[in-house]
């Protein structure tokens, strides 16, 4: 019915409706532009609320009427329950629809005769009811066509079978298709079998490459290919002839694809409320991609964990040539790559837990791969992952009561943490925010220029405080990580299950002693004192104990009432053991640790050390350096040079005139305070070292011998002389043409030959006496 043919009442109603619609539209447009007053906006809200209330009430009334009608029907139902025997008799199973449907399904599976011939009229029960206007199953409606006479035709067509099936229904009945792994090649000869294997392997290589390229080209569209790669990782639908190489290729390819397509953020699972909301097509596609990626990422990690766990267990000494071991070690490497390359992504903490647990493996290759990955995580300064890793190691050590690999504890040394949070310092952000609101409140009483200036200054202060808070958060993670590291160290020291664990523990305490809380200082110093007096403790471990004590005493622990003289005596005595260490790596570690410790003892604390004590260390250090090979000797000579600079009065030890202290130097006494080293000189030792073939060692020795000049022919290259002794040795060792893989003992051999002529042997207790005689003979 049109407007012209309508009655007067209907015309008025239509005009009113159009006018209302236009008014509402104008009001909404003005509201968006914020040009309406508050009263008008409140009035519009009230009108909308009344309309929605009426609609809700109508829906409630309809629901109440429906419930009342159902209850009335149940009350009027006079049908009584039948006895059990009548119920049994009423069921004719053989002629029921369920039996007919089952028979048809069985015939279809067994390839029987056409089932249409045996269909009964009773099968109507199993068919879906079809209503008018409802499409048949498997059909879809196309765009309608309007003819000239106004008739609408709604064409339909059969749905195209989608190539992408539901991901969760990927398991297909084995009998429906001929799977490649069921093909029988037993009739082939050896050469034909090799050719067939090569063809199959190339076919799967092409398949893997195709899936990977599609994923990298468009991850959101082709994410289903990740499922196919995962199935190949499991060896599904792969012939046993090529299953092993295909699985390894698929594992490596899936790993690289995952690393390339994971986003730079952690995917958050949507809540039920978010899933029920209407979303844009782009948003929905992104959500589907993230869900699929996360699902198959988790499945891949679970597969890696399952394969790698086969390497761990009691009496698990795996043969490295077996397929199980190869897949296990490949899985370990995959887990390590993921956590190193994407520490921000989901399940990183789960990977860390798995790697820490894998460190219990008996195989050294597995332990090395795991520990290398953990070291890399520590070095990358991802403090959240560092904190979780430190906590996982601490938990494992406590749970296993210290029965873990020393390599696992050595990984803690790779933590790049040099500072921890100061809990006493508080942020002033709350005060600044309060001040900001106060300034805004007082805006009316200020000029615009003054208000803007104050607000800008306050905003700058807030940005600075927020940056400090971000740094404070990182410091908090670092503090927590160090807390768990110290907890691990104290747990091992408390139990001391094996001496193999002492070295990484003492080295860790030595490195991070400056980060210890002050309340632990006295306990640590007491523990180190008891341990260092153990004669069975290795020289390197003794140096770690001594260094830990002096790092504490050089910082906040200098106020402690502790006499360090006993630690000076212990350090003085341990120097005699260096020439007898034949392992190059161990000797290098000893020299580096000794240089660091002695610099703290004699240079950092130079105001608290008497000159006679420093002179005794100089004499013994140069004496020991004469029988060491070139690089360790250079490190010691560089350290002695820094002692001559820090203590200028040591110049009396290199002067020709007799002006030293009275008395005789007692080289047989292991107490630097009573050895009277100022009564001796070091010219013979320096002259011997200056004759070495190593150019840098000779230059350093001559520089000390001639009074540490900064100019002239005996000056040193500033780029080398400014380096720390252990850094200098490391650089020259790395730049050497031949690797430092063996200890040169020719100087010690000459010393032993000289002692043998007197029917004596060289030991740590008498080595200084024999060196003195040897230098006198060689002069």
Curated annotation (Swiss-Prot):
The keyword Glycosyltransferase does not apply. One of its GO terms (biological process) is DNA replication initiation. Keywords: Coiled coil, Nucleus. GO terms for cellular component: nucleolus. It comes from the Eukaryota. Residues 114-124, 161-178 have a biased composition (Acidic residues). GO terms for molecular function: chromatin binding. It is found in: Nucleus, Nucleolus. Residues 434-474 form a coiled coil. It holds the Pfam family CBF. Residues 1-20, 100-189 are annotated as: Disordered. Residues 136-160 have a biased composition (Basic and acidic residues). Belongs to the CBF/MAK21 family. This is Nucleolar complex protein 3 homolog. It comes from Caenorhabditis briggsae.
